[in-house]
UniProtKB/Swiss-Prot annotation:
A GO cellular component entry from the record: plasma membrane
Species whose genome carries this gene: Rickettsia typhi (strain ATCC VR-144 / Wilmington)
Cystine pairs: none
Gene name of the record: lgt
InterPro entries in the record: Lgt
Listed EC numbers: 2.5.1.145
Protein name per UniProt: Phosphatidylglycerol--prolipoprotein diacylglyceryl transferase
Name of one Pfam family that matches: LGT
Amino acid sequence: MILPNINPIIFSIGPFSISWYSLSYVVGILLGWFYATKIIEKFKPEITKKHIEDFITYAIIGIIVGGRLGYVLLYNPLKYFANPIEILKTYEGGMSFHGATIGIIISAYLFCQKYKINFLSLTDIITTVVPIGLFLGRIANFINCELYGRITNSSFGIIFPNSDLEPRHPSQLYEAFFEGLILFCILAYAVFRHDTLKKQGLNSGIYLIFYSLFRIIIEMFREPDIQIGFILDSLTMGQILSAPMLLLGSYLICRLNSK
């Protein structure tokens, strides 16, 4: 299958333009906010709808700043240190999920300190809605023909425009399905069938474990970033950065089981 060359810009009006990537962020945040408020209405945890509304600004800053700096520092530092002004061009792409995770964790911590609420209670809500953004973000990656997979002879192979014209795994769709749709369903099942919000840190632990496992496995099909390549012969940066998430998620679950 040959993927058509889709314009990454949906439309432009003068200097103003909307890209698929930016649209995925906006829609993801709005849907996440809507879903979080519905969960709060039903289960009435410590976190209120007002808290979520106030946290959105913190979340946006954490995602954008953390995601961009994470990409700059972890994936292409030499390029951006040579041309620092390029760091500000987020509209050209180049965001790190792991960097965004650190950014939103810091934002959540500062928010909880200001409003005197439990940190894990907030992250339990956040992690429940994150798969929505992950799904939309990976679909945008697919449309933009970026972050594609390794060369394959399987029937899943897709020829991406502006590439080497070899059939490759559509790893963006694998991630959208597992890290987005499947993880969303797992967390929704945990919340609505087992009321996991009653145990602070449980949802966060479930999310961290499943996301990191899915990411580590799918990285086996994803082409490593060209400027980094493989680390220690066979590992990718995504796998290495996901390992601490797996350990932290396991710790949160074990911590609850030991009580």
